[in-house]
């Protein structure tokens, strides 16, 4: 009884929705049936062939289905590598020989040659990351971080020479990487480190000759552009520990904030000031949840890198510089080593790989829902044509529609009263019963045996027309169900 009363109270709510759905369903069935019939006649196929034969299709918008389109989003890292203090380092390779390093407002030039500038008798000898006598405080940690990234170990490797920062000649640090005598293993290790973070550089030193690295402050050249892939390599090279499994730790929980630190509603928005070059695109909390569940997407790595940079700037501005060492210890929780290694192997094998810049996704134009962006692969320094991975974005659209239908089905199940389900069940039983009666069949009219049906005239027992139009034929009649 209580269930029936609850059902009666909910009638105004679900009847309004059910009635509208019923009316729309009837209309759609009629329209779809008519279109299907028209489609089966072949007229549409002929018109489409005559219009499109010999013409090229536009690539501006790819329509996968009726309401799904293939779209893309481009990420700009100009805000990530901005001119602020204590930011992520940015590396540049100019003309394959000039190496540069920049972090915050400090920039450095790295020269590699055989000319000795500093001597142990006249300059400072350092064997620890404390370079306060060589550089200012905002430059010291950057240089020490870079030296560790190329493979130098302070507690095991030879010391370095640097010029006292009070001298008028300028700040300078000198590292001996000559691959000769007892220094050969150390030299090879640092050379490999340079090759790792500066891909494509030319080696100016030869085996057995003197080779020195000189680091000195210098203005950032205008022809150097931000290359976040070098930053990725730098971070992965300078990590202190490697975890076998990659899971997002509590320290790197998502911080959905704007540039001022305010929490915006509706999810993580990649705004013009931060990522998207041409427009605003918001990726809701659903995409964030997918990234937290599955750590196997280049797009998720990019978002984690942005979030890490914001947290690092806030932490370093409020606390001491020693916090950088703690952050670098846990940097491996940000970037998936498996993805980096996989993309590098693809690059070496000349197969498509990801450079973490351009991503594509499938967008549903009616509901605004979209799939999790996936990396747009590169081959031979150019992005793949969208037709080359057509199966991937068609499959992604199928997954998106399946996810939407599953979510809609769950919501409708929650809004459907149990009594309505009972009514639907008994109405189905009633329909099955009437269908059984329809299959048995009942006679609908009477006509002369062996001859055509005289409808709309009715016959009498003599085989004549009751209205008198036809004379009695004295022929047997029979009841028939079909005209």
Curated annotation (Swiss-Prot):
The keyword Ubl conjugation does not apply. A lipid is attached at residue 2 (N-myristoyl glycine). Belongs to the arenaviridae GPC protein family. Keywords: Disulfide bond, Fusion of virus membrane with host endosomal membrane, Fusion of virus membrane with host membrane, Glycoprotein, Host cell membrane, Host endoplasmic reticulum, Host Golgi apparatus, Host membrane, Host-virus interaction, Lipoprotein, Membrane, Metal-binding, Myristate, Transmembrane, Transmembrane helix, Viral attachment to host cell, Viral envelope protein, Viral penetration into host cytoplasm, Virion, Virus endocytosis by host, Virus entry into host cell, Zinc. The cytoplasmic domain of GP2 plays a role in ER location. It also contains a zinc-binding domain that allows SSP retention in the GPC complex by accepting a cysteine from SSP as the fourth ligand. The chain crosses the membrane at residues 18-32, 34-53, 423-443. Residues 33, 444-483 are cytoplasmic. The gene is GPC. Disulfide bonds join 92-224, 134-162, 205-211, 269-282, 291-300, 354-375. Zn(2+) 1 binds at residues 57, 457, 465, 467. This is Pre-glycoprotein polyprotein GP complex. Stable signal peptide (SSP): cleaved and functions as a signal peptide. In addition, it is also retained as the third component of the GP complex. The SSP is required for efficient glycoprotein expression, post-translational maturation cleavage of GP1 and GP2, glycoprotein transport to the cell surface plasma membrane, formation of infectious virus particles, and acid pH-dependent glycoprotein-mediated cell fusion. Zn(2+) 2 binds at residues 445, 447, 453, 483. The keyword Zinc applies. The record marks 58-59, 249-250 as: Cleavage. GO terms for biological process: fusion of virus membrane with host endosome membrane; receptor-mediated endocytosis of virus by host cell; virion attachment to host cell. GO terms for cellular component: host cell endoplasmic reticulum membrane; host cell Golgi membrane; host cell plasma membrane; membrane; viral envelope; virion membrane.
């Amino acid at each position: 009884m209580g269930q029936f009363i609850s059902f009666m109270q909910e009638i105004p709510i679900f009847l309004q929705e059910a009635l509208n759905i019923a009316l729309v369903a009837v209309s759609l069935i009629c329209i779809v049936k008519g279109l299907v019939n028209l489609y089966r006649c072949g007229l549409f196929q002929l018109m489409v062939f005559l219009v499109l034969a010999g013409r090229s299709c536009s690539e501006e918008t790819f329509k996968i289905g009726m309401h799904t389109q293939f779209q893309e989003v481009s990420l700009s890292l100009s805000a990530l590598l901005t001119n602020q203090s204590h930011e992520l380092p940015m590396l540049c390779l100019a003309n394959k020989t000039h190496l540069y390093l920049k972090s915050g407002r400090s920039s450095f030039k790295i020269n590699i040659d055989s000319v000795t500038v500093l001597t142990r008798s006249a300059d400072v000898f350092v064997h620890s990351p404390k370079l306060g006598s060589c550089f200012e405080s905002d430059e010291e940690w950057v240089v020490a971080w870079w030296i560790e990234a190329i493979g130098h170990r302070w507690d095991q490797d030879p010391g370095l020479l640097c010029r006292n920062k009070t001298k008028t000649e300028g700040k300078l640090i000198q590292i001996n990487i000559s691959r000769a005598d007892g220094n050969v293993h150390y030299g090879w290790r640092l050379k490999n480190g340079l090759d790792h973070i500066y891909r494509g550089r030319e080696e100016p030193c030869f085996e057995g000759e003197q080779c020195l690295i000189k680091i000195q402050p210098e203005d950032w050249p205008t022809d150097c552009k931000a290359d976040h892939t070098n930053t990725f390599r730098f971070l992965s090279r300078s990590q202190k520990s490697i975890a076998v499994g990659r899971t997002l730790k509590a320290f790197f929980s998502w911080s959905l904030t704007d540039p001022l630190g305010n929490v915006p509603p509706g999810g993580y928005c990649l705004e013009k000031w931060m990522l998207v070059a041409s427009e605003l695109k918001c990726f809701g909390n659903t995409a964030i949840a997918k990234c937290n569940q599955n750590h196997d997407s280049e797009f998720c790595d990019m978002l984690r890198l942005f979030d890490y940079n914001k947290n690092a700037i806030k932490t370093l501005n409020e606390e001491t510089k020693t916090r950088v060492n703690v952050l670098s210890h846990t940097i491996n929780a940000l970037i998936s080593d498996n993805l980096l290694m996989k993309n590098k192997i693809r690059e070496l094998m000349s197969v498509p790989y990801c450079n973490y810049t351009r991503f594509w996704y499938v967008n549903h134009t009616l509901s605004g829902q979209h799939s999790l962006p996936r990396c747009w692969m590169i081959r031979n320094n150019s992005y793949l044509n969208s037709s080359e991975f057509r199966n991937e974005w068609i499959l992604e659209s199928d997954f998106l529609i399946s996810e939407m239908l599953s979510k809609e089905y769950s919501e409708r199940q929650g809004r459907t009263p149990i009594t309505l389900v009972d009514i639907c069940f008994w109405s189905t039983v009633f329909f099955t019963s009437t269908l059984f009666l329809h299959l048995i069949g009942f006679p609908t009219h009477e006509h002369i045996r062996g001859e055509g049906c005289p409808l709309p005239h009715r016959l009498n027992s003599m085989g004549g027309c009751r209205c008198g139009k036809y004379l009695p034929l004295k022929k047997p009649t029979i009841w028939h169900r079909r005209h």
